């Protein structure tokens, strides 16, 4: 096992749109261009059992924000404990990588239940693990920043995910969950 290591990376995704007169207020054609994502990433391992990931997004909003800032302890094999700011383990796209999504739009459940699948600038903890090459499970707790009820009490989100993958080999995966 690697005791210490790090990698630096990033991604840049740009969007360009051309509108005909139907979609503009004045009836004229228009266009826009912007960076959907402009992310700088630093991740790695320390003391063999500790992983870290820090990502800053300089994208669409014009200001920078931490997309992820998390530390994971991997010493309880096969269970991992992650704490910090990260996307909850909600769907396949976020569980694998947002760099390599199969389509530009995520499934509708992300919009239908957005309160349970987004960190919303908050913090959380997640416990996840695998059993053989067949089962994966995770449980998470997140508290979104500025998400209080009318009495000022923080609203929390809880996620539970289970996956069964009867076929999981390079290039071929069949999974449920």
Show the residue positions of the predicted features:
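Outer membrane beta-barrel
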Residues: 2-177
């Amino acid at each position: 096992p690697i005791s210490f290591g790090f990698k630096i990376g990033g991604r840049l995704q740009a969007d360009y749109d051309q509108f005909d007169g139907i979609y503009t207020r004045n009836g004229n054609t228009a266009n826009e261009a912007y960076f959907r994502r402009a992310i700088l990433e630093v991740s790695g391992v320390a003391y063999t059992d500790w992983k870290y990931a820090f990502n800053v997004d300089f994208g669409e909003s014009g200001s920078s924000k931490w997309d992820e800032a998390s530390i994971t302890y991997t010493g309880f094999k096969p269970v991992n404990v992650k704490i910090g700011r990260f996307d909850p383990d909600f769907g396949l796209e976020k569980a694998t990588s947002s760099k390599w999504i199969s389509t530009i739009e995520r499934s509708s459940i992300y919009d239908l239940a957005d309160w349970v699948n987004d960190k919303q600038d908050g913090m959380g903890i997640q416990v996840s693990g695998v059993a053989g090459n067949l089962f994966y499970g995770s449980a998470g707790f997140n508290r979104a920043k500025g998400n209080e009820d009318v009495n000022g009490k923080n609203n929390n989100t809880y996620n539970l995910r289970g996956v069964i993958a009867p076929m999981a080999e390079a290039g071929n995966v069949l999974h449920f969950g």
